[in-house]
Amino acid sequence: MVTDRRGFLKSTMAGALAATAAAGVRAAHAQGAKIKPGGRDVLLVVDVQNDFIPGGALAVKEGDAIVPLVNQLAAGFEHVILTQDWHTPGHISFASAHPGKKPFETITLGYGTQVLWPDHCVQGTPGADLHKDLKIPHGELIIRKGYRKQMDSYSAFFEADGKTTTGLSGYVKDRGFRQVYLVGLATDFCVCWSALDARKVGLVASVIEDACRGIDTNGSLGKAWEQMTKAGVKRIRSADIAV
């Protein structure tokens, strides 16, 4: 028996709207039509920061090549949210914080397996800044993640324990967004985790493949696409978007 009719109706309507959004994406692909972002769609620009660009501390190959395309796509969206890796000095994810360990080795922490990274995106440093050529003046929100010293964060929605929220899930719910399109760095880590968690909180999620770049360490890129496909994340191209 339903005791909270208002909550039940709200949940039912949200599910129906999400299903409608997903159907719209499928129909656009089936008909070869371009996807026109609407008022319930949001572009999520993930970690386009100096330390992830060639020459940075944790450079993603060709990471800078996506910047013009991200700008072009952002111009076609009414709503844009950006994320920013924002680590403390001596962060638990840094290899330098673990004597004898090297970057890209793994350790086990309370929340699971942790890849150890070179020091990167340290709060207040130039490496943590968004790329200078990123031009998104209408960006509505910047989500900073990874600022808890004892926990890493890849996802824009949750920290690495999968429970501690960044606040983004509440924000998108309050704003009434139903569908998120993801671009940025890196495909197989922060973009992937964000896309999976977008599905977890009930959003339709599409990754714009050519507006992302991956690290692909030990086959991580292929594994990420497998995970995303299994979770119902759409894999699309910038040419699919009407901008």
What are the roles of these predicted feature ranges?
Residues 88-92, 151-152, 190-191:
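Short catalytic/ligand-binding loop motif for oxyanion handling, primarily in non-cytosolic enzymes
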Residues 22-26:
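C-terminal segment of classical bacterial N-terminal signal peptides
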Residues 137-166, 170-171:
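Histidine/lysine/aspartate-rich catalytic loop segments that bind and position anionic ligands
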Residues 192-200:
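Histidine-anchored nucleotide/phosphate-binding helix
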Residues 177-193, 207-213:
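Glycine-rich anion-binding loop/nest that anchors nucleotide
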Residues 31-147, 174, 178, 200-207, ...:
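Active-site acidic carboxylates
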Residues 1-16:
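N-terminal secretory signal peptides and thylakoid transit peptides that target proteins
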